[in-house]
């Protein structure tokens, strides 16, 4: 078993997310977060010979799995990079409109469970946290140079951590003496400065989440890709997004809401809402969460939320 496959990953909302795409046999689809290919393989099983699937991932280990799949299935195209490059990547592959796009946001189980990646406080390892280990600044490098204000804003805003001030003061004091370059060092600093404990949650959870989100620009990428997908979806094409925490889910929810309804017209407007063109998106069903059986089999699925939207014939506002 290769290193890329040695950590088990259970795909969350597998059938629900792929069902939401309403896969057409000859369609062109995008899996913006390939991971270990759970969603991608199910999409491929529903595509005919003329169908096509483009997969994105930042993680070199995920890309190794994707490229192996592409060697055995010519319908698959692989993009090593973040999904914020959605339109540029499709242009490079000669692809115009697509029939659907799926995004399973956040961190994958193999990334968490591979202690050497530095995502988890459960292991003592170099403090890295990069999804793409071939580029960018590691968490340890950023912590070494970030201002106290930047540290505070990241931990407070991305981790929603009540004790961010205390944690940051301790980080600044510690790094003046020695580098904070391992997961254990950071976790110990946090634990010493979080005064109350949330049931079933390690005190380092929020701080690690915050730094990971910042290092990988996760929220910025979500905000950047959604309008690109809307522009590239064919009429009737579907967007399906699985989010795992409130910050990213809020971005998705607000985007879909904004483009699935009209702005309220002022009372003096000469035009009626009924005369306006339909909005470019329509919401498909309600937000879907995993059932009890899935959560029992995979506790990490507990916080997942699936939202789905469909492209209409309506124009995209400028």
Curated annotation (Swiss-Prot):
Binding site for S-adenosyl-L-methionine: 37-39, 57, 83, 104, 111
Recorded GO CC terms: cytoplasm
Top-level taxonomic group: Bacteria
Location(s) in or outside the cell: Cytoplasm
Substrates-to-products reaction catalysed: cytidine(1402) in 16S rRNA + S-adenosyl-L-methionine = N(4)-methylcytidine(1402) in 16S rRNA + S-adenosyl-L-homocysteine + H(+)
Enzyme class: transferase
Signal peptide segment: none
GO biological process, one term: rRNA base methylation
Predominant cellular place of this UniProt entry's protein: cytoplasm
Keywords from the named record: Cytoplasm, Methyltransferase, rRNA processing, S-adenosyl-L-methionine, Transferase
MF terms in GO: rRNA (cytosine-N4-)-methyltransferase activity
Family in the record: Belongs to the methyltransferase superfamily. RsmH family.
Task of the protein: Specifically methylates the N4 position of cytidine in position 1402 (C1402) of 16S rRNA.
NCBIfam families on file: 16S rRNA (cytosine(1402)-N(4))-methyltransferase RsmH (TIGR00006)
Name of the featured protein: Ribosomal RNA small subunit methyltransferase H
Source organism: Neisseria gonorrhoeae (strain NCCP11945)
């Amino acid at each position: 078993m290769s290193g890329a496959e040695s950590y088990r990953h259970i795909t969350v909302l597998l059938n629900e997310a792929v069902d939401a795409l309403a896969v057409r046999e000859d369609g062109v689809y995008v899996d913006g977060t390939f991971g270990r290919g759970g969603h991608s393989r199910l999409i491929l099983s529903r595509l005919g010979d003329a169908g096509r699937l483009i997969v994105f991932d930042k993680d070199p280990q995920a890309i190794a799995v994707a490229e192996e799949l592409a060697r055995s299935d010519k319908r698959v195209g692989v993009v090593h990079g973040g999904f914020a490059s959605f339109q540029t990547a499709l242009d490079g592959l000669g692809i115009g409109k697509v029939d659907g796009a799926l995004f399973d946001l956040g961190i994958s189980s193999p990334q968490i469970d591979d202690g050497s990646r530095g995502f988890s406080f459960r292991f003592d390892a170099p403090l890295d946290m990069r999804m793409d280990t071939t580029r960018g600044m590691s968490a340890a490098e950023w912590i070494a140079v970030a201002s106290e204000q930047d540290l505070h804003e990241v931990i407070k805003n991305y981790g929603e951590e009540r004790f961010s001030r205390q944690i940051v003061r301790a980080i600044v004091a510690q790094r003046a003496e020695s580098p904070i370059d391992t997961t254990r060092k950071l976790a110990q600093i946090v634990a010493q400065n979080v005064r109350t404990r949330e049931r079933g949650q390690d005190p380092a959870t929020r701080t690690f989440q915050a730094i990971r989100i910042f290092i990988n620009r996760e929220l910025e990428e979500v905000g950047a890709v959604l309008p690109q997908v809307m522009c590239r979806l064919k009429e009737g094409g579907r967007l399906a997004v699985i989010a795992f925490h409130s910050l990213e889910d809020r971005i998705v929810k607000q985007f879909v809401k904004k483009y699935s309804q009209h702005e309220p017209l002022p009372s003096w407007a000469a035009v009626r809402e009924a005369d306006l063109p339909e909005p470019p998106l329509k919401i498909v069903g309600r937000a879907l969460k995993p059932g009890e059986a899935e959560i029992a089999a995979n506790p990490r699925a507990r916080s997942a939320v699936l939202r789905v939207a469909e492209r209409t014939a309506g124009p995209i506002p400028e």
